[in-house]
Regions:
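Metal-dependent phosphohydrolase cores
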Residues: 2-196
């Protein structure tokens, strides 16, 4: 479990890494090289505001469609605020801070740059799976549905049982027991969902 104090240590580490990049850029290319890196980070951050806002709106629509109401009203709003107020940090640093701090992300980047997994009881699985499901509607770089995301990133992890149960409870997965064993089938529930 990562306590608040540990999370702050990680955030400071991510920010320090960004400043280290700035320092290297300044040493190699001088003032204008540093300025170009800062401007690139600011430009990328501002371009991600609309990208993240569209995802936020779609998330609420998908959650209302799957659950009948919106529970996670402020999904990813912290990212939008960081893009607006701290754009010089850059998209990568802001994403690292977001995945560490938010409970709907099962993994984060540790201090050594490796992928670390949060304990399964600390993850908000319903929000995570709705997030995976709606990403395909607003993020061209993330075309997978929730079940395919599970298969690609978490299939052999300790999260399997809780992910499958959440997919079933949201109506995204059907289970059939056959002589050959258990068969999972993705439902057509999202086929009728329209996002505009």
């Amino acid at each position: 479990m990562i306590c608040c104090k540990e999370k702050i240590k990680y955030v400071l580490h991510y920010v320090k890494e960004t400043f280290k990049d700035y320092s290297v850029q300044y040493e190699i290319f001088g003032f204008f090289g540093l300025l170009s890196l800062i401007l690139r980070n600011v430009t990328e951050s501002y371009s991600h505001i609309l990208y993240s806002y569209k995802h936020h709106v779609c998330f609420k629509k998908v959650e209302a469609y799957l659950r009948g109401r919106v529970i996670h009203k402020y999904h990813d709003v912290d990212k939008i605020v960081m893009y607006a107020l701290f754009p010089w940090l850059g998209v990568e640093c802001i994403n690292h801070i977001h995945t560490l701090w938010q409970d709907h992300h099962p993994c984060y980047k540790d201090l050594d740059g490796n992928k670390s997994y949060k304990p399964k009881d600390e993850v908000e699985w319903t929000e995570a799976i709705v997030d995976w499901e709606c990403a395909r509607f607003t993020k061209p770089d993330k075309p997978l549905n929730a079940y395919d995301t599970y298969l690609k990133y978490y299939y052999t992890s300790e999260y399997t049982r809780v992910i499958i149960n959440t997919l079933i409870s949201l109506g995204l997965l059907n289970v059939k027991t056959t002589d050959a064993g258990v068969v999972y089938k993705v439902t057509d529930k999202m086929d009728y969902f329209k996002y505009e």
